[in-house]
Amino acid sequence: MATPVVLPDGKKVAIDLLSADLPDVHVMGRLPEGAALNAALPVVRVLRIGGVADVRGWADPANRDNPRFSIDCYAAAEDQAMRLAQRVCAAWELLKGRDTADGIVTGISQETGPQDRPEDPNADMARVGMTLGMSVSPPRSTS
């Protein structure tokens, strides 16, 4: 009987690597509520919005996941949110080949570039977002 391949949590890989590349930014999967969000700015939120596993052989299990993410960049002003989004895109371009304890990035994609995603007009922040993708495989074996 074949041993199933447990694919890495691509969202965790993305958050961990972006956090390392953007040490002055709070990178997370869930936003704090109310005033706590304003206090945490600048913030990058990573939401998995889809993607499927692939690279199946004739009788082999999947060994790569291809998550797609909606990435939202929050800052105090529109120009700051756009600049943060550009920094995220620049960091994303360099993720291929990097790894964490959870997995290795084997490919990246940018499906939409930074775009305005207006918040409530009464909010004291701006949001710019984009759709990014990656391919992740289980960590390399050290044995």
Can you describe what each PLM-predicted range is?
Residues M1-V5, A75, N122:
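Charge-dense, low-complexity intrinsically disordered segments
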Residues N63-A81, V88, A126-S137:
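Oligomerization/assembly interface segments of phage tail-like spikes and tubes
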Residues M82-K96:
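Short, hydrophobic/π-rich interface segment
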Residues G29-G34, F69-D72, W92:
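Generic detector of contiguous secondary-structure segments
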Residues M1-A59, T100-A101, T142-S143:
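Small/polar-rich, solvent-exposed N-terminal microdomains that initiate assembly or binding
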Residues W58-N63, N122-D124:
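Short glycine/proline-enriched loop/turn "hinge" motifs that connect secondary-structure elements
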